[in-house]
Amino acid sequence: MQKIKLWFGVCRPYSLFISASPVIAGLLAFRKIIDIPTAVVTLLCAMSLQVFSNLVNDYYDFVRGCDKAGRSGPQRPLAEGIVNEKQMRTACIVALSVALLLGAYLVWVGGWVILLVGVLSALFAWLYTATRFSLAYLGVADIICFLFYGPVASAGTVFLQCHEFSLAAFYAGCACGCIAVCVLASNNIRDIEDDRAVGKRTFPVRFGKTAAQVGVALILLASVAFAVLGFGTLWLLFLLVPDIFLYVKLLKAEGKAYNICLFRFVLLDVLYVVAFGVAFWL
């Protein structure tokens, strides 16, 4: 039981909703009867890829010397000596294997389009911190984060249901993708000095803390606009209220307070999906 609890924490369970939200949002925007088995497998596959991405990220950040014991961010298992490198590599293989098994069913349902999406998703999850050309170190992770935790996931989910492109699902996914970028931004603003020291050229490192904060404000505004477009109802403008509250908290944050901001943005993602659920029934 203790070992299960340990690995559950290593997988960063709080992050799983970031991968689940565009899948759920896409299904809600679809507004039609869905094939439940396909929807469930889609959700599990997305979450498996998220776990794989988390584990790979932990492994390569440790190998590169980016993660160290006593860091200001959430505890990292390798850096703290909780698990060793061999165990982490094995966990990466297991997570990827689960995603591939689930993905095989989705390819059978959706064909070559889903195969392409799946291959790119797994590839970018690996490339995020792996190899000398890792996306996180090149400063383009925000774009990939928006796409694959947003419109790619939501539109792909609906394509599996009807083999058609859904603009509503695309917009709903864009809203989720924006919040995912805010989660990443909270992490990167917090780690700006540590990342600069190891050559990790994130957006805050390249353009500064102020530019990153302004970027978050614009992204939050865009998320509400996409939500309204996806569900065609102006009452979703109420999402501006929690957006403003969390943005003010982000501006005031220092050090480990960014960890609270990060988790609050995850909760904001939950709120968005709940709001989409209400919009679905109205």
Question: Which residues does each predicted region cover?
Answer:
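Topogenic membrane-insertion module of multi-pass membrane proteins
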Residues: 1-41, 45, 133-136, 141, ...
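Small-residue-rich segments of transmembrane alpha-helices in multi-pass membrane proteins
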Residues: 17-26, 143-158, 204-209, 263-277
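Membrane-embedded alpha-helical segments that form the functional core of polytopic membrane enzymes
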Residues: 32-59, 115-123, 166-186
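Acidic (Asp/Glu-rich) catalytic motifs at the cytosolic membrane interface
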Residues: 48-72, 182-204
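Multi-pass membrane catalytic core of lipid/isoprenoid biosynthesis enzymes
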Residues: 70-112, 200-232
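Intramembrane alpha-helical segments
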Residues: 76-164
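Functional transmembrane core segments of multi-pass inner-membrane proteins
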Residues: 144-192, 210-213
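Extended hydrophobic alpha-helices typical of membrane-associated regions
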Residues: 229-282
